[in-house]
Amino acid sequence: MSEIKLIVGLGNPGDKYADTRHNAGEWLIDRLSRRFNFTLKDEAKFFGKTARTVIDGHEIRFLVPATFMNLSGKAIGALASFYRIRPEEILLAHDELDLPPGTVKIKQGGGHGGHNGLKDTIAQLGNNKNFYRLRIGIGHPGDRNLVTSYVLGKPSPADWALIDKALDEAVVCVEILLKDGITKATNRLNGFKA
């Protein structure tokens, strides 16, 4: 396994979207910033907010794209290219319709499953799908015609309580991943349910 060098949190910019399900990846970066005491700063050349810190001897970069979701690959591609970070050294946190609230999973590779942030990231990384995904369950509205309004809506209080617990567990798992590797982090998440 390659060492993770970049952790990305997907979301849409602006206060209007801050509390929407589509910003689950950004919620994780916010928690990681509090846990590891780093501050994101705007960096125009990377089309987003970035930070760098050292965790357990590993230099890690963080990125929250300032672009809308469907263009987030532009930021990821720019930063990865500049620092020569390979796709398999990237952990991308995003909302996942196919997992219920309170669930979080790690996987490597795969398609975009209709997620525009993943779709653009794959394209901007030269069609390389080999990055890791930290999939934060938000549930599904039950009808694909309702997906857009669902991901751009706020979770119910009950769903938020489950997502909140899953985000706390994700922070612990990022620490495990950086210290002990992807397998231990994945195994822990496989046994987790909020």
Swiss-Prot record:
GO terms for biological process: protein quality control for misfolded or incompletely synthesized proteins; rescue of stalled ribosome. InterPro entries: Pept_tRNA_hydro (IPR001328), Pept_tRNA_hydro_CS (IPR018171), Pept_tRNA_hydro_sf (IPR036416). It catalyses: an N-acyl-L-alpha-aminoacyl-tRNA + H2O = an N-acyl-L-amino acid + a tRNA + H(+). Belongs to the PTH family. One of its GO terms (cellular component) is cytoplasm. The keyword Hydrolase applies. It is found in: Cytoplasm. The lineage of its organism: Bacteria, Pseudomonadati, Pseudomonadota, Gammaproteobacteria, Pasteurellales. Monomer. It comes from Actinobacillus succinogenes (strain ATCC 55618 / DSM 22257 / CCUG 43843 / 130Z). The keyword NAD does not apply. Its EC number is 3.1.1.29. This is Peptidyl-tRNA hydrolase. The record marks 95 as: Stabilizes the basic form of H active site to accept a proton. Its main location: cytoplasm. It comes from the Bacteria. TRNA binds at residues 17, 68, 70, 116. The record marks 12 as: Discriminates between blocked and unblocked aminoacyl-tRNA. PANTHER family: PEPTIDYL-TRNA HYDROLASE. Keywords: Cytoplasm, Hydrolase, RNA-binding, tRNA-binding. Hydrolyzes ribosome-free peptidyl-tRNAs (with 1 or more amino acids incorporated), which drop off the ribosome during protein synthesis, or as a result of ribosome stalling. Catalyzes the release of premature peptidyl moieties from peptidyl-tRNA molecules trapped in stalled 50S ribosomal subunits, and thus maintains levels of free tRNAs and 50S ribosomes. SUPFAM superfamilies: Peptidyl-tRNA hydrolase-like. One of its GO terms (molecular function) is tRNA binding. The active site is at 22 (proton acceptor).
